[in-house]
Amino acid sequence: MYQIRILDESNKVKISTIAELHKHAFPDFFLTQLGIPFLRTLYFCYTEDSESGIIVAEDSDQIKGFIAYSKDYPRFYNQLIKKHLLRFAFCSLGAAIRHPSFIKRLLRAFNKSHEVKKEEAYIELASICVDPKEEGKGIGTRLIDKMKAITDFSVYAYINLETDACENDAANKFYIKNGFRLNRSYVTAEGRRMNEYRYYGEKR
């Protein structure tokens, strides 16, 4: 039986498991290429930030899936730079040496705070991941249901997320099935086509 809960301060030791799970679920993603130490630092920041967090799905105390989210994404990015820039730089040094093009892309990612600003208060579902061996068991839906349950839609206009538009049919269908609506599609500076989805709660 899966237990869905918010990761608390006493369980930060599980950040390493979350980083490994990200690596196995998204082996070809840019952040994965930056290495496990980088991922550990990133997900630690979600537990450290008062307006962010990680929801986990556990079975026998083993993490099988998670969501990382932020109630103030622009502020979250600013805090990454102010508090952990040197740590991120150190963690990604090896990847930058192997792939110099990563440097420009990483700088662009850290300068994202102005891009994620929106008129309304919203919650960013920044990452959702399920152990590939556990797919098809409803873990992703239960994680999203927990995200919906802890969101006060009288304060936040919607839950926002982004995902690849191409060769990603299963994920796009999954979000639509779970009540998300396509808000826009766009192309990143690297030429990656993305879909942005929003969930407005029961008010729409």
Annotate each predicted stretch with a short phrase.
Residues 4, 124-125:
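Hydrophobic residues on conserved beta-strands that form the core of alpha/beta folds
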Residues 74-122:
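Conserved acyl-donor/pantetheine-binding loop and adjacent beta-alpha core of acyl/acetyltransferases
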Residues 1-37, 54, 62-84:
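Short amphipathic alpha-helix that is part of the acyltransferase structural core
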Residues 116-123, 151-164:
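Conserved GNAT acetyl-CoA-binding A-motif
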Residues 111-113, 141-142, 166-184, 189:
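Conserved active-site alpha-helix within GNAT-family acetyltransferase domains
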Residues 127, 136-149, 176-177:
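Conserved acetyl-CoA-binding loop-helix of GNAT-fold acetyltransferases
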Residues 126-135, 160-171, 188-193, 198-201:
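Conserved beta-strand-loop-alpha-helix junction that forms the acyl-donor binding cleft
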